[in-house]
Curated annotation (Swiss-Prot):
This is Poly(A) polymerase gamma. The lineage of its organism: Eukaryota, Metazoa, Chordata, Craniata, Vertebrata. GO terms for cellular component: cytosol; nuclear body; nucleus. It is found in: Nucleus. Pfam families: PAP_central, PAP_NTPase, PAP_RNA-bind. The gene is Papolg. The modification N6-acetyllysine is found at residue 2. The modification Phosphoserine is found at residues 23, 524, 602, 651, 711. The keyword Acetylation applies. Residues 509-531, 538-556 have a biased composition (Polar residues). It comes from Mus musculus (Mouse). Mg(2+) 1 binds at residues 112, 114. Binds 2 magnesium ions. Also active with manganese. Transmembrane segments: none annotated. Residues 677-688 have a biased composition (Basic and acidic residues).
Length: 739
């Protein structure tokens, strides 16, 4: 009998459909306690408005039905105007497809709908942005209609009966569009222009994800929880270098493939388990990439050298496969890995009955994490200009993060995705002001009592990029300004209200750091880090409120000096070598002598999942306490010691850890050989273009030049060199850090 029951279990496991590029880690079915934890998870999410009621769902369906009818009417009319035969006009069709969070079934209350208008071959893109746009103009219930034709994915945005809709367009190389059209068929991409392929890609990826998960309802609930957690923890933003909705969906889908029968509460825990131990930059794949004869560019590090430098690749499952996380930087990956580890520790506590789900959804206190911040301010003179300006500046903040983390003295630059209204007292000229905050961790320097750090060029390169982009697209108007200021944590109250800055209830990591076992480590870190509070800031820009509200005291016991330059533009006259008039002036960056190996992108040294899985290699798993060797704990201190951290007081029991390691070990043995062929070779190559040790051309101003940008920003680098060799520097930020 025992043998028969064992055979029955094996047969049932063989019959279960296999998802993903490896076999599952566990086929265990949920227990009663798992369902209880899942219901508690649902209850914890309800106050955040993640679930729509039946009435709201039906309203969305009605709106989409109206839009679908409008599209069919428009395509029929335009077919008739192009003298197609009546028999063809009657059957030409047309259809609206949804994608994104709405198609996945995880949209929240009030969320917009991403939709795709699919038209037959005789309908041009220009028709969509002209005649269909005009048709929408005269439609009842449509408000805030605007077209963004020059976007990466061209789109028409509008509000239809209270529902915001982003509508993109694609025409297929077929004569009619039937209601049962399947966009997952790769042949639909044949003979299409790149804009149509991009428009179709959203639907194709979304549909493919849903086809690659074992249980759609469990996937949706798990994804709702993970997306809410990511938003609450400040790591939900593709634009700023974190992850967007599609990337989070693919990570959750991969977790569902590894634990196909698990309940949502278990899957949330396993999500943190898998990705806190993932060896980036190994790619996350939902299926093996498929070959196609369409010759479209796909993500493939073996072919494309630039793909080898992606830090956190998550590959879309639909052809042409792309990396959805190309914006991720070293700093944003570091922050996310730390959050994965924090999430694992919290869910361990929850599933042990020591805590509840609300703890997982607690926001971090970003303004208590770091000792140093950069305040980025975007201002404009009118509300309309401000909305445009803020959108452009925000889209370029990741350029600033990249500049800062390439600075040899900076370990981490952490941008808070939330923007804040500016203090009007400090920006009396402009009534519309937005601020972003970047937490900075400075790197220690061996055998140095103090270090002079100049961030001027990092900031100026960023502001030049934004102004130049605005000028190129004719957006730049009078009153549009960017300012960057260095402030210390104790100065933040000049910028933000007390309720935002006040210390919240201690987080799990704060509790662990305050435990006695970590006191010795903290003191050793402080003694080897130049990120102390006794630093000297000699370059805070003119607009810092500190200079106006807190006079410097040179006789203070700590020797702290806080002085700010009094003018917005620092004019530095230097004896520079003569330069021919036709050439630009090249000034080396401060600290240009950088060891190339120190600035190259490298894989984190987490030793939990081996990079190469060989036939004769038995994976050996260790569990380092630091997220990445040499990676900073996100508390404003650069962690560069190799000491082993004592076991945290809230760590799970040893037997639980052992079980988790067995799960991961099983996963390792089954992991795909997709990455084997290139891992060893590619890791030897380092991106030289990310090294910050080369000279940067500093643009100069010709005083005889008649045309100036409205923003008074520096002109482009082709400007002639003035005869008096005066270098104009804006947003000057210089500071001195003492040990």
């Amino acid at each position: 009998m025992k043998e028969m029951s064992a055979n029955t279990m094996l047969d049932s496991q063989r019959q279960q459909k296999h998802y993903g590029i490896t076999s599952p880690i566990s086929l265990a079915c949920p227990k009663e306690i798992d369902h209880i934890y899942t219901q508690k998870l649902i209850d914890a999410m309800k106050p955040f408005g993640v679930f729509e009621d039946e009435e709201e769902l039906n309203h969305r369906l009605v709106v989409l039905g109206k839009l679908n009818n409008l599209v069919k009417e428009w395509i029929s009319d335009i077919s008739e105007s192009k003298n197609l035969p009546p028999s063809v006009v009657a059957t030409v069709g047309g259809k609206i497809f949804t994608f994104g969070s709405y198609r996945l079934g995880v949209h929240t209350k009030g969320a917009d709908i991403d939709a795709l208008c699919v038209a037959p071959r005789h309908v041009e893109r220009s028709d969509f942005f002209q005649s269909f746009f005009e048709k929408l103009k005269h439609q009842d219930g449509i408000r805030n209609l605007r077209a963004v034709e020059d976007a990466f994915v061209p789109v028409i945005k509008f509000e239809f009966d209270g529902i915001e809709i982003d509508l993109v367009f694609a025409r297929l190389a077929i004569q009619t569009i039937s209601d049962n059209l399947d966009l997952r068929d790769d042949s639909r991409l044949r003979s299409l222009d790149i804009r149509c392929i991009r428009s179709l890609n959203g639907c194709r990826v979304t549909d493919e994800i849903l086809h690659l998960v074992p249980n759609k309802e469990t996937f949706r609930l798990t994804l709702r929880a993970v997306k809410l957690w990511a938003k609450r923890r400040g790591i939900y933003s593709n634009m700023l270098g974190f992850l967007g909705g599609v990337s989070w969906a693919m990570l959750v889908a991969r977790t569902c493939q590894l634990y196909p029968n698990a309940a949502a509460s278990t899957l949330v825990h396993k999500f943190f388990l898998v990705f806190s131990k993932w060896e980036w930059p190994n790619p996350v794949l939902l299926k093996q990439p498929e070959e196609s004869n369409l010759n479209l560019p796909v993500w493939d590090p073996r072919v494309n050298p630039s793909d080898r430098y992606h830090l956190m690749p998550i590959i879309t499952p639909a052809y042409p496969q792309q990396n959805s996380t190309y914006n991720v930087s070293t700093s944003t990956r570091t922050v996310m890995v730390e959050e994965f580890k924090q999430g694992l520790a919290v869910t361990d506590e929850i599933l042990q009955g020591k805590s509840d789900w609300s703890k997982l959804l607690e926001p971090p206190n970003f303004f208590q994490k770091y000792r140093h911040y950069i305040v980025l301010t975007a201002s404009a003179s009118t509300e309309e200009n401000h909305l445009e300006w803020v959108g452009l500046v925000e889209s370029k903040i990741r350029v600033l993060v990249g500049n800062l983390e390439r600075n040899e003295f900076i370990t981490l630059a952490h941008v808070n995705p939330q923007s804040f209204p500016g203090n009007k007292e400090h920006h009396k000229a402009n009534n519309y002001v937005s601020m972003w905050f970047l937490g900075i961790i400075f790197r220690r320097v061996e055998n140095a009592e103090s270090v002079n750090i100049d961030l001027t060029y990092d900031i100026q390169s960023f502001t030049d990029t934004v102004y130049r982009q605005a000028n190129n697209i004719n957006m730049l108007k009078d009153g549009m300004k960017i300012e960057a200021t260095h402030v210390k944590k104790k100065q933040l109250h000049h910028y933000l209200p007390a309720e935002i800055l006040q210390k919240k209830k201690k987080s799990l990591s704060d509790v662990s750091r305050s435990s006695g076992g970590l006191q010795s480590k903290r003191s050793s870190l402080d003694s080897t880090c130049l990120d102390s509070s006794r630093d000297t800031d000699s370059g805070t820009p003119f607009n810092s409120p500190v200079s106006a509200n807190k006079p410097s005291n040179p006789d203070s016991p700590t020797g702290e000096i806080e002085r700010s330059s009094a003018e917005p533009v620092a004019v530095v006259v230097e004896k520079l070598p003569s330069v021919p008039p036709a050439q630009g002036l090249s000034i080396p960056v401060i600290g240009a002598k950088v060891d190339p190996t120190a600035k190259a992108v490298s894989s984190p040294a987490v030793c939990t999942i081996p990079t190469v899985v060989g036939r004769n290699v038995i994976p050996r798993i260790t569990t380092p306490h630091n997220p990445v060797q040499g990676q900073p704990h996100l508390n404003g201190i650069s962690n560069i010691t190799k000491n082993v951290t004592p076991k945290r007081s809230h760590s799970p029991p040893t037997d639980g850890t052992s079980k988790r390691l067995k799960d991961i070990e099983k996963f390792i043995r089954l992991e795909s050989a997709f990455k084997e062929s290139r891992a060893a070779e590619d890791r030897k190559r380092k991106p030289m273009d990310s090294i910050g040790g080369e000279s940067m051309p500093i643009p100069t101003i010709d005083t005889a030049r008649k045309k100036r940008l409205p923003s008074k920003e520096l002109p482009d680098s082709s400007s002639p060199v003035p005869a008096n060799n005066i270098r104009v520097i804006k947003n000057s930020i210089r500071l001195t850090l003492n040990r």
